[in-house]
Regions:
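Enzymes that bind and transform nitrogen-containing heteroaromatic metabolites
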Residues: 1-180
């Protein structure tokens, strides 16, 4: 069975979106071939994704995890029972209120591959429950000053072990193991 990991692109000051929940700042980023190589290596081993309820809106607007380059099951947290959505060869399954259940379903669907956690709230909840094995961050050379923090409000100390770090012209890529 693969790892459960947080995967996020964030600014140097720790934000994954601006104060309006927008990630438009990502449109101006310039990645190098080496950056794409690192991202593709991570994405290639993802077998399922767990995201928050906010992802439902972005999916309805056309966004898909990993740009649709890989087809995988997606499990989205919600407070309201919702039928699965089939879109562009991917199945979006909605799980009501139980993040541990969503992660277990994603692990079963992923088989030997990894499960990626996308979004700040989901990431913090999974860290608190001890469900996260690794954290993979792509840090952009940008300061937003305010916005939605990836780890803000976590409320506890989580010890990490650095697995890998690489830096190219555009991004710094960091991978950490969560010490349990």
């Amino acid at each position: 069975m693969g790892n459960v990991f947080i995967h996020a692109t964030m600014t140097l000051d720790g934000y994954i979106a601006d104060v309006n929940s927008s990630v438009d700042w990502m449109n101006d980023l310039v990645a190098t071939d080496k950056d794409y190589e690192v991202a593709n290596k991570v994405a290639a081993n993802v077998g399922a994704v767990v995201g928050g309820a906010n992802k439902t809106n972005t999916i309805e607007e056309g966004e898909v995890p990993y740009g649709g380059t890989i087809k995988m099951p997606v499990f989205l947290m919600t407070h309201t029972p919702t039928d699965p959505i089939e879109k562009d060869g991917m199945t979006y399954t909605f799980v009501v209120d139980d993040i541990a259940q969503a992660v277990e379903a994603a692990k079963a669907a992923a088989g030997d591959k990894d499960v990626a956690l996308l979004g700040g709230t989901i990431s913090r909840q999974c860290l608190k429950l001890g469900l996260v094995d690794e954290i993979v961050l792509d840090v952009e050379p940008l300061l937003l000053g305010d916005g939605i923090s990836l780890f803000g409000g976590l409320g506890e100390t989580i010890k990490l072990e650095r697995i890998d770090t690489s830096a190219f012209a555009a991004e710094t890529h960091m991978r950490y193991r969560v010490i349990k």
